[in-house]
């Protein structure tokens, strides 16, 4: 008898909030959005694949000041009756502190990170913006890790695929999740920060590589169209409602 595909679910976790008073300062290299103010959210995600769990991004640390979440990922997982040691994989979109802040709380997880970012973390000196401290456990050989040079089919059945989308950082990744009932989802990481720059292929002035960013946006949008996927821009609070409110999971 053919083995059935394990159930896959997707749950949004709150990993911080912040108001950006003028997004024209950093989030465009073409002088767009003059004086525009936007709220940002910092979203993380729990992916359940059968009996296995994966985290996508780990948000701000609890000591990050005003942007920090009110409840840690560990405590949110406890509400779902999931223990830190049950997390098998942690996929990191990129090495910035607002996506890696709570990574040290999951030393037993296998880290999945783009090779360009891993190389930037290990460089001397490390690349600007890399939250090196969060990766110490894996840098010292204490945990399993894989530096991804291409896409990664995490569970081997095409239900969760980390997609290479460089540009924001050299090893930036996004992720695709296929759900039986809710359909396909594409989570951006920081490929785009809000709808206005996603729609216009806008590039933040602090991105690592402009050309790679634009090419990654093109790839991501074509994939979204072909998959008829729901696109979730992780920093845009207008996209929070695309998934059920915590603790409910999309299935």
Stretches with model-predicted labels:
Residues 1-82, 86, 182-189, 225-230, ...:
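Metallo-beta-lactamase
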Residues 15-16, 58-61, 95, 116-117, ...:
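Active-site metal-binding loops of divalent metal-dependent hydrolases
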Residues 64, 72-74, 110-112, 167, ...:
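Short, electropositive alpha-helical surface patch
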Residues 90-100, 165-172, 233-237:
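Histidine-centered catalytic micro-motifs
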Residues 174-176, 181-251:
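Cap/insert and terminal regions of metallo-dependent hydrolase folds
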Residues 66-113:
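Active-site metal-binding motif and surrounding structural segment of the metallo-beta-lactamase
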